[in-house]
Amino acid sequence: MSKSARPIRTIACTVAALGLVLAGTVSATAATGEPSTPVPINPPDGTVMSYVVNTGQANPGQTRKAEKAVTDAGGVVVQSWPEIGVVIAQSDRAAFRDTVKVKGKNVVQSVGATRSVEVKDKVTGPQAPWGPGSSGWNKGKNKPVNGDEPTEPVPATGSDSLEGQQWDMTMIQADQAHQVTDGSRNVLVGVLDSGIDPTHPDLQSNIDVADSVNCTAGGRPDQAAGGWYPTTSDHGTHVAGTIAAARNGAGIVGVAPNVRLASVKVVNDDGFIYPEYAVCGFMWAAQRGMDVTNNSYYIDPFEFWCDDQPDQAAVREAVARAVNWSSAKGVVSAAAAGNSGLDLTVNTRDEGSPDDAATPTPRTINQGCKDIPAQVPGVVTVASLTKDGQLSYFSNRGLGEIDVAAPGSRILSTIPGGKYGLKSGTSMASPHVAGVLALMKSAHPELSPAQLVQKLEDDATPTACSAPQYDEGAACVGTPELNSYYGHGIVNALKAVQ
């Protein structure tokens, strides 16, 4: 979500250098409207839970002190991110949150549980040494990710035989953009998702193995062979194909078919994207010099994270710091707006959170409750369109909340096993935008993330309000240049490369 377009108070956090004071980025008193319904997370002793621990300043000294506070409080340090002053911890002590604040009273700003159930991915052994890795490039109940619809398999034969079925590429003028460029090998897109099939003929030549990683081991980056492969979901492979399926005589062609892809696995085998996984993903993308990330998910277990709830506010703080640090390091991020058919400017109910619990807690929410990462300032928030250009019935919407729109209904792309399938969701819209950003970065490598976002919005095709699909959901409001369905308009790949 572009900061300039947001009409309400949100997280505001810029992390550009070590030693920066990080106070007051999320205020529990700033939410507007009725207080949100508390969702207590009070595990008994002996239940291993995961936590974010945020320091007041982002520097190695405070991070070391926070780590000591964690261990003194009976916790285990899973992963530290001194660049942003965030420590990921696990503990089986019921009083861990209160105790770590006492032990780190001059350092710890906030502490929050990252999930409502016991940790499956318990971590043993020391974390890797601090500091960025070097890029390899020179210069259960399988919860549907983001609520997307199931995949419909599609057969493929012959040379790029399915390209003629890619109406989505025509809508965003990617086919015309390819006459200018297919993208640069110097551009790397991080696919924060469920993993990418490295054997798919349309993807294997574009996957950067050296920069791929698994973040689902408690939020600790793991480059073990095969760790970033898909296991229980085809979601990430489908998203990857939309971004950068190669022009190679097989199947389809992506928006940016010559850029590289890194699989950054943030979805576990049960289909959950916990906050520590996403923080790991954004930090990894920045450390490895990625140019673009795609984020076709919302962070579990809450569809909306409320700043008047201490646990949720601490998590939002950690995620915002990671997103902003990645942006400061040159990464621009696109995210799915969500599939609940909601107007994000007026939503007051959340019926399905926490979604990792046996029984969710229906709750009142307010405008201090946000879908993350889509509603983190600086992230490009993408709505979904049908083949005829209408807003998809499932797509979230909202004036000042949607930045751009892109095709997301019945999108043809790659799935594991060398196959192809149709999927629907804002998850399918976001990678079109990530691909356009990759083309734009290829054609204009000098542009910063903020400049890329500005050009993306300026280049979008203004689109007047339409009737809601099937007459469902809130009606469109605004002008052709900025409205609640299309944001600044339909993303335009051709203008991106000009």
Where does each model-flagged region fall?
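Active-site alpha-helical elements of protease catalytic centers
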Residues: 185-188, 192, 221-265, 274, ...
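Extracellular S/T/G-rich loop segment that most often corresponds to the catalytic His/Ser-adjacent loop
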Residues: 331, 356-442, 446, 454, ...
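Substrate-binding/access-modulating region of protease and related hydrolase catalytic domains
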Residues: 266-373, 416-431, 482-483
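Secretory targeting and sorting signals
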Residues: 1-31
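Autoinhibitory propeptides
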Residues: 3, 39-40, 57-60, 64-163
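Active-site core segment of subtilase-fold serine proteases
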Residues: 137-257, 280, 287-314, 345, ...
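C-terminal subdomain of the subtilisin-like protease fold in secreted/lumenal serine endopeptidases
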Residues: 31-44, 78, 117, 290-297, ...
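Loop/turn elements at helix/coil->beta-strand transitions in domains of secreted/extracellular proteins
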Residues: 106-108, 184-188, 257-262, 287-293, ...
